Each structure stands twice: as structure tokens, then as C-alpha cells.
Amino acid sequence: MAAQFYERNTSGMNADRFMTRLTDESTVNTMQRHYWTARQFIRTKLGKKEDEHLEASDNELDTCLNLYRSVHGTSFQLLNNVDNYANFLLDETLVQNVLGKYLKEKGKIDKTEAVGRILIAVGRSLLFSSHRLNAARIGVSTFYNKLSVFVERAIGDCSQTIEAVQMCRTEYRGSLLWMKKTSEELDPEVDGSMEKFREAQTTVKSNKERLDRLKTDTLQKVDLLSASRSNLLSYVLTHYQNELYEYYSKTSRAFETLAENINCYNNYDFEILSHLATGTKPERERKSEKEESAKTSQPRGNEEELKNLLFGRESPQFGEEEVQDESRSQCDSPLIEDVDDERRKTGDLLDLESAASIAFPIGPLATLFDTSSFVPPILPPPKPNAVSDDILSLFDGNKANSSGKEASATTMDWQSLIDGFDRENEDNLL
């Protein structure tokens, strides 16, 4: 069985715990023991290296202490996170409840019958979601209470044992230093040297016995602490997981029923705020196919109860009205009209007005060119022999007159042709 506890036959108070030690030891031995304990404590704080054999004997205890520190730190972190999560769930529940009541009140006073029913339905769905979320929040609160009790009692009790075993190990190592010092100064011929060594040896033995008992208690308590926390988490989180799954399943079915009932109403197209259009909706055929595939993958239950809960007697007949197929896409907001359609309409109107203002002639088209008109031939280029290299030939009057007559005749032929072409074009245009 487990070893006796280190506070056996005592009331647990500090004065009663050390009463036997005060009566058995002398004042000098007590002062020496405290001196070597303080010296060992200072060595530990300064990071002095201990004997490797002494450290190897405490490997199991060090592993147990590391496990305790991990359980202690993670438990406090988990407690803080669960507290924050419970507060966030409470805020979300209150927001959904207030928003649901607000939508119900506005739906009752709305002048449009369809919009009023939709607002009432959405408000009821939000109230239903807030009630289910509040039920899931109760599980989180229960988890927080049980975890706080575990941290306060189990970890608090184990921390006392950890502190005791660490203090006892410091005293034991300090007594070893004391015995090492007395053994180096041991001289059988000197009076009182053997008594000092026996006192140090007795202190080492008593500290070793206490340390062994505390090691056993520490190992058992830390193992039990880790196992108890695992059992607590598995038990509480299983209930929370079931409540969370029930919340999501019921709220999802409620919102699916709400969407089905809202789709029965006709959409309203407004001609304002068209400049805010940012995108288009998917086609109704694709949307209906996706909804049907999602419906077939998840079975439904108690749809009539959810309809009655959300809509009451104001629920429209779902399934009787079929939505007409629309080839064109609609904008995301019901208050926004498609910008492309509006531009196309305005462009068509402008084209019609400009076309109506132009008077087109009725009858056969007029001819633009007369194929029977005379086209003068192009004169061949001058021969190289016609040009004389002699400068005196330029002053020849006969040749100059003949070339001038030919150039003037060619110019007159081209001028008459251009004038005749301009007259024909003017007649056709008139």
C-alpha cells in the first residue's frame, strides 16, 4: 500500500509538525542543519553543478515534477480560455435575442404584408437560435465550474506535496554537504570529532527517509492528477459536444425551412441606387440544383414543427408556387438594377431617335460615276533625244512654242474632265 504521509500523527500545523524535531535535537545541531540547508539553497539558486550520481538518482522525481508543471500551467490556461468563451457565448446569445425581438416588432408594424411576414420569420428563427445556444452555453458553464474545483482542490493539494518534496531534497543535499565536511575533518584522536560525524550521519539518514516517502507520495499524486484531469475533460467535453451538435443541427434545419418559405415570395426590382451594383446573382437553375443536392444528402425531420415555430399560421404554402426560370442574372441587392441592362436600354432609345430624324430618299439609287464619259489618254514620257545639251537650243522660238501648245492642250482636257465630274456629283446629290 501507499507509504504513510509525511504529516502522520500531526494536526498539519507548522508548530506541531516540527515539535518532535525540536525536542530531539540540540540547538547547535539545529543551527548547523539550517546553515547547510541555506547553503545548499543558495547553491541551487546560483546554478551550481551537483554531483552526477546524485542527479541520476532524482531523474524519476524530476520527470514527475515536469509533468506536474505542465498539468498546472495548462489547467490554468484552459480555465481562463473557458471563462472567456462562456462570456462570448453569453454576448452572442443576448445579441441574437435582442435582434430577433426587434425584427418581430418591426415586422408586425410593417405596411407591406410580404416584408412583414419575412421579418417576423427571421426574428423567430433568431430567437430559436438564441435559445438553443443558451442551452449549449450551460454545458460550458458546467465545464468551467468543475474545472475550477479541480484546479482549486486537486492541483492545490498536489502543489503542497511538491513544495514539501523540493524542500526535503534541499535539506537532504545540504546534510550530505555537512557529512562530507565532517568526514574530511574527521580525526579519531580529537575529542568530539566522531560525535560530530555521527550527528551529521543521523541527519542524513532521517532526511533520506523523509525524502523517499515524499517521492512516493509525489509520484502517486501526480499520476492521479493527470489521470483525473483526463477523465474530467473526456466526461465534460462529451456532453458539450453533444449539445453543440444538437444546436447546429436544429438551427440549420430551422434556417433551411426559413429560406424555403422566403423563396415563395416574389422579388421586387427597384430603379434606384443602380450605381452601387457590384456583382450578379447566380442563375436560379444552378441554385435550385445545389439546394436539391444538399437536401438529399441530409435527411430532415420535424419540418412542420419548425415551420409552425418560425411562421405560425402566417406560413405560405410551400411547394405550390414555382419560381419561373430566368435566363438573365440579377443583382445581389433587390434595390439595385443591372447596370448593363440600363445602358443597353438607353443606347437603343438614342439610336431610334437619331434614325427617325433623318429623311432617306425613296426610289432607285442615283449613279455616282458616268462610264460613258471621255477619259483623255496619258501622254508618254519625253524621249531623251528631245532634250538638247546645247544651251543655245533653249532660245529656239519654234520648239518653245510647239511644246507650250501641247502642254496647254493637255491642261484643258484634264480641266474639262474634272468640271464634268463635279457637275454629275452635284446633280446626284440634289
UniProtKB/Swiss-Prot annotation:
Any matching Pfam family: Arfaptin
Disordered: annotated span: 279-342
Transmembrane segments: none
Membrane topology of the entry: Peripheral membrane protein
Domain of life: Eukaryota
Record Gene3D superfamilies: Arfaptin homology (AH) domain/BAR domain
Tissue: Expressed in all neurons. Highly expressed in m2 pharyngeal neurons and some pharyngeal interneurons. Also expressed in the excretory canal and the gland cells located just below the nerve ring in the head.
Disruption phenotype: Mutants are resistant to aldicarb, an inhibitor of acetylcholinesterase.
An annotated Gene Ontology molecular function: protein domain specific binding
Complex and partners: Interacts with the GTPase activator protein tbc-8; the interaction is direct and may be required for the activation of rab-2 and dense vesicle maturation in cholinergic motoneurons. Interacts with rund-1.
Protein name per UniProt: Resistance to inhibitors of cholinesterase protein 19
Source organism phylogeny: Eukaryota, Metazoa, Ecdysozoa, Nematoda, Chromadorea
Gene expressing this chain: ric-19
